[in-house]
């Protein structure tokens, strides 16, 4: 079940600027670049002969492009495989006013090697897995189970888990082991499951360290690896001063719900179960994160949790919108406690609860939005 989707990410800045396009493996970077920049000079560093040639002599890139027109646009796919090329790219940008689109799946590889990151001469963009607005006839249940990486979402049922298993295996082998990012691959593998168990919850480094038999410093380093290899991200707590004391620890989410489903063995989830609820929240956060990044508000997401246990899953901006995600067939007053408490602190906030309700309604100033309708409103810019 293969299909190409029109991606929402805006790369039009490439008409005037250079771009770093980061994204996890199989998010569709190569397909996107080939579609958006058809006809441009293209270096695919996954091709062995191209990679070997430029690894042996990085200055050959400059020599080849000296013959190109000033200001020409050049695409280099998987730049982290030959980071030494960035010195040549820098020279070509400053001397020949050339523009580059540089893709990569690991910012960590560039940081670790202390390579030239172009001194702010390239804009940073991030490609996420597919989002609902990019898929005709979006299937919520399929997305909850298979995730939104193109090869997984469009996979047949009898192949999808093999592909997800292979994806995690390749990540461990090529991103972690081959790059010697960790000394103990077994401990890191154990950590991945511990991170999956706490995905969407406040991060407790001490508990994870104890569960994995490693120290807290190592746990923090492992989370940093997940972030810099695009496999996960932290959502900070909302810290605007108010009456109630709130927790400060961030929440962690894997970049795609399929990773958590695989690590925890969630193959067939039924509505009404805790695991279905966790996957539902994860998918909704995944969509919100992508929307905020693509719309230029990448740092606008936080969550709110008081010491008394009241919480809101997503706070947008400076408290402008508060959103709770509940995979229930019909929202009840008990599901609104966190939002109402947030409203007591920040009365100007727009309150939204996203659920499996069949129709939208307004309950005590809280918008009850069916999940698919919420996603449509989100991507039309009607939520934030």
Model-predicted regions and their roles:
Residues 29-30:
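Conserved lysine of the Walker
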Residues 21:
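Hydrophobic anchor at the beta1->P-loop junction of P-loop NTPases
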Residues 158-320, 327:
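Accessory nucleic acid-recognition modules appended to NTPase machines
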